[in-house]
Amino acid sequence: VVIDAADYAKVLEELNNGGVTRETKFYLAAKVFENTAAYDALISSYLRGITGNAFPDKLTLTYEKAQTMRYGENPHQNAAFYKNPLMTPGALSEAEQLNGKELSYNNINDANGALDVLREFKDEVAVVGVKHANPCGVGVGATVAEAYQKAYDADPISIFGGIVATNETIDLEAAEKMAQIFLEIIIAPDYTEEALAVL
């Protein structure tokens, strides 16, 4: 069974050369079962959500590969980023990368940590700095620029090369402050055009 149009050319080529190889058959079979298992797991997850059963006797989770990472926890390791198809609002997996190089495992881990801390600030303009899975600065202010300055001042050494996240739109003033040092990732719900030109 061929369930992915991306595999058609490979299967046709092998058929034209005498038959589909054993290796390809196992590859295709695995792909079919991955998809049917994922489908069943999604239905189970949906129904569990309706019934409110948070702790079922058996739990099957399914994730879709979002991207291959630049590298794993260390440069010699491989990694991939998977997302839950039944994503929650504000999940990192739904973020759009606007520019920059491919992300690494550490980038994803730090970005997720920054968002976890940021969720604690629902009614305040906040900025969180994270590096190597540790918060290195948190600031609250009237503006993103003010909150960023407080987060930066908490530890101006550690925040260099780290991840910064805010829960408000980044404007030109905030972008100019952030652009003064190297930051791996800057996360925000939105950016003004002027801010994007600086970053």
Task: Enumerate the language-model features and the residues they cover.
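Active-site cavity-forming subdomains of large catalytic enzyme subunits
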Residues: V1-V2
